[in-house]
Amino acid sequence: MTNKKVYISQKDNYAGAFGLVYRSSANFYFRQSNSFKTTISFMDYWRIKRGISVMVVASTRSMDGKLLMREQLTFKNGSIINFSPDMLRSGIAIFEGAIEIEVFASENMVIPYSAIMAVYEAENSISMVHSYSRTYSPHEVEEGRTISAGEEGCWSILDTQRVASFAIIHNGSDIQPEQSASLELTNVLNKKTSVPFSIPALPPYATFKIIPQHYLPSIISFLDGKPGNAAVSFTLKNSFTRMLVGNNTTDGSEFQVTHSNFNFARHETDNAGEGYAFMLVPPAKFRDLTVVVYPETTKGQYKLETPEGKAYEFKSGERLEITTAPGILKFSKLDGKLPARIVTALTAKAANSNAILPFECSLGVLHKLRPLKGTFWGIVAIGKKYRSRLIIYPMEVLYGEAIDNELQLYLYTQESREPEVRLMHGDEILQLGKGMYLEEIFPRFQETHEDQYGYFYIRCSNYGGMYCYTTLENELGSVSLEHSF
């Protein structure tokens, strides 16, 4: 199965050309047991950024789409909501399903994708991912502002005797009939195999898990102990096709996820013209730090240049993995104009890690079409259970020298509508570029607050070229990295 090509405009995305947005939303895979916890976390950025009051509704559903719980979530006590419904009260040992967060406003919110995080805590690991899927609003369906023909890739598969890969898709508001789908796998030698499989009829709001080992029993020998790649062709009804993708250990002790992205070898995108695109590799002292360029790039020949002066040439369809020093990577296209989107990732383990699974953070590249951005916010761990690093780095290679000599850093919590504030200067700002733990920035604050997820927030009045990452790290050496909103 291959879907009809869809044109994906990055220029429209940058411009916020989504029509009238009075509802924004996000769907998340949700699992709960005595050894596994899912938390849906988000900041009241609608009020903080633009002064917009919103109503938030959370709907918890089973895997077959049945509505089990619907409730209103409020920012009455603080600026952060950390939501994890107790689904084990009825005696269920393990609950698996999905949570939909819907946000409603009487003003145009501009972006229909809510900026929300999911945090997954397994026995030995922690992992996070930002919003990936959403159910379209009726007016978006009527206006044709939908992408439901799924050509999704950028999914690293690590299958071994101890590890199984998986992907999660969420159907929308109508029945999706039974369908023939296809799975294309790529190994470290860039050898490919295509596997057809069936997806049963999906009821409205159903969640479906794709496990490659079920469809290709020889996948472990095909990968031969090295990371590979998967891409999927499928269709949904009235739902955005982005998938949750990841790997878990077969004993359930570790679980690491990121999100898929468009297969740009099949979908189309606009171009960024001549010149370079850039990617930041943060100086965070990870172990086994690897940069991944997924194989689903616009057709053509490319070159990647590292901070050490090494150069790698690759073409569409090839998965490229390199180790590199921290710094700025440069991408160019050797046979035409640079596409607006090249999907990349960072993958690594903590320096002191005994973890089996690395984190993987799906990213992309920055180029001259990306507009200046003045506000950033991202999740951090508050309290003693987990630690967080905050990395704020000026992309001077693209936006010129950072001229701000002070930075006002806000920390929002679930306990107060007002933030903690720290004004940083000179050398402190330089240190943020290398990464600082939250307790180094707000030392007493960390000691006096209960364990929770909060959010940092910065507003840059004079410089719009910052790039930010945060981490969540546990005491066992598991780490997760995500870029900011």
Which sequence ranges carry the predicted segments?
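Gly/Pro-rich, tryptophan- and cysteine-flecked surface segments typical
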Residues: 1-485
